[in-house]
Design a protein with these regions (language model features):
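Conserved catalytic-core segment of clan PA serine endopeptidases
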Residues: 43-63, 101-157
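N-terminal activation segment of mature serine protease catalytic domains
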Residues: 31-81
Length: 294
């Protein structure tokens, strides 16, 4: 009898020990938990790189004509052309500070104050900023030297570009026409990209070409195309305008072939060279011999 009680006591004690062990194990699982996942507040380098890759995706909405863009500054709007995936061709006078009476100065505006709007309809579908402005030391009032190339903050991957004709000069009698985002007072619709009526080149100077064209405010800096091609032979600079966009008036376009160094400098700056490491630009046309020494 005493032996059976002893056995039952031993079994009860062992059951208590097993139960205590189970409780200790269970409580141990609650106390000793694995490390919790932590989320970084700031994006990692991999996340930032992924954002850059998204920005550099091809523009599936773009059409070839979207290479012609709208240039928007603090006091003006002009037209420009994408000539490389990070370079915009436009007019010099669009990018200088104005005096108290609207007169043009020689001081180029801050590139950060300029934005490029993409798309040719009434509303832009994208925009990009400007990192640097390359322009000769003349042309701020229009005419000779009135060209400029903008270096963009990022590449516009997948967008079409248009080619400046730098080697073959324009010819008298050659047909040409401008394109721009201008709008005249009697224009029937809002601002959008439009091809303008042009005609034959009537006269040439070393740095300009003269023709009759329909031009509106805002067309400045727009490309002047040789007829039947996408080659740019000039940019819109000066024109005798009235309120009607169908009126063709005497117009002066800045030649591109006279300022090939502007394009070369812009390419070097876009590739990472500091602007102060380049020789200064001059207003002597590239296609003319230097003046004779006295």
């Amino acid at each position: 009898m005493s032996r059976s009680r002893t056995r039952r006591g031993a079994l009860a004690a062992s059951n208590v020990c097993v139960l205590a062990a189970l409780l200790a194990t269970a409580s141990g699982c609650q106390v000793f938990q694995g490390p919790k996942t932590k989320f970084a507040v700031r994006p990692s380098a991999q996340e930032e790189l992924a954002d850059v890759r998204v920005l550099e995706q091809p523009f599936v909405l773009a059409v070839p004509e979207d290479a012609i863009v709208r240039v928007v500054g603090p006091t003006m709007t002009c037209t420009g052309t994408l000539i490389d995936d990070d370079l915009i061709l436009t007019a010099h006078h669009c990018l200088v500070e104005r005096g108290p009476y609207g007169e043009f100065s020689k001081h180029v505006i801050d590139p950060a104050s300029v934005r490029i709007e993409l798309g040719g309809d009434y509303f832009a579908w994208g925009e990009v900023g400007v990192r640097h402005i390359v322009a000769p030391p003349c042309g701020e009032g229009g005419g000779a030297g009135d060209i400029s190339v903008l270096v963009l903050k990022r590449k516009l991957i997948g967008m079409s570009t248009m080619t400046p004709r730098l080697e073959a000069p324009p010819r008298v009698g050659e047909e040409a026409h401008p394109v721009g985002f201008g709008r005249c007072a009697l224009s029937p619709d809002a601002i959008r990209r439009k091809g303008r009526d042009g005609g034959p080149i009537r006269a040439l100077s070393a740095e300009t070409l003269h023709m009759d064209a329909s031009v509106c405010p805002g067309d400045s800096g727009g490309p002047v195309f040789a007829k039947g091609s996408r080659e740019i032979i000039g940019v819109v600079s000066l024109s005798a305008m009235d309120h009607d966009e169908t009126t063709r008036g005497p117009s002066v376009m800045a030649r591109l072939d006279a300022y090939r160094l502007v394009f070369a400098h812009a390419r070097l700056v876009a590739d990472g060279l500091a602007p102060n490491e380049l020789p200064p630009l001059e207003c002597t046309p590239a296609n003319l011999p230097p003046p004779p020494r006295r």
